[in-house]
C-alpha cells in the first residue's frame, strides 16, 4: 500500500489581503495543513474579514472562532498576536513554511527570526534584501537549488506581471532598454480622503488618483 505524502505545514505571519486570499486558496488543498496565523487583529475580526470580502465576495464555507482559534470548514487554526517572529511556536507546530505577508520584514536578518523560532523555510510576499532567492513563477522558479533552510522572496506584484513578458522578449528579440508604467489599485498605504502624509503623492484621496 502506497503511503500518502506528508502534508506540508504552513503558518501565516500577517493576515491582510495577501494572507487571507492565500488561506482561501489553500484551506481546501489536501497537500497543505494550515497550522497557525499570527496577526495584529483579534480572532473575531480575522473571522469576519475572512468570511466577508468586499472584492472577492463571501467565503462559501463555514467560518467561526472559539477562544484563540479560527475555525474554517472544520479546520481549527491556532491564532497568535505576537509582534516578534522569534517568539512564535514554529518548532512546536513543526512548521515547514512560514508565509510572511506583513510587509514589515523585508530583509534576511529580520526574516531569520522565523528560522530561529523553528520554521524550516520562509516565503516573503514582497521584495526583500539579501534573501536566498527571489523567484518569479514562470521565469526562474526551476533555477533555485533547495537548501536545508530557505528564505525566499516572491518579488512584487509589478515584477510578477512584467518579468514573464520580458523573458519572452529577451529570448526572442533581445532588449536594449525599456520603460514601463504600472496602473495599480490603491492599497492600505493610501487614504480615502486627502490627509497629511510624508509622501505628498499619498496624501491625496486614493479614489481620485491614478496610483
Language model region names:
Residues 206-211:
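Short, intrinsically disordered, charge-balanced linker/junction segments flanking boundaries
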